[in-house]
């Protein structure tokens, strides 16, 4: 296990504290439970600009994009971060099919690249420490999504 600095631990705790902000916590809960876009059109139809759901999407994605930017710059030890921040993996897994369209629409090939990069590194770390766990998580999430609500 790599040595971590006081500053890294302090930053990690500050990021965790931000996650506890009531509105962001509500947005994160909604995102994990409800955000399953099949296309950008589907997303915009279900969650139009100005809707509370659209606000939640932007809050969650912008929070994790900021965090990923910090992680990718090496300001937090990867292992320290990956041990307790699997949610970023779920966020990217939910948005990855529509990101290429957003990148094209905004003519920005780097749009959400920080989340994508952290996701890839987290998945590699997870597979090293728990082989097959990413596939198992994807299968579990697919089952949850396919279940009718209230079932």
Where are these regions (language model features)?
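Acidic, Ser/Pro/Thr-rich low-complexity regulatory regions
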Residues: 1-151
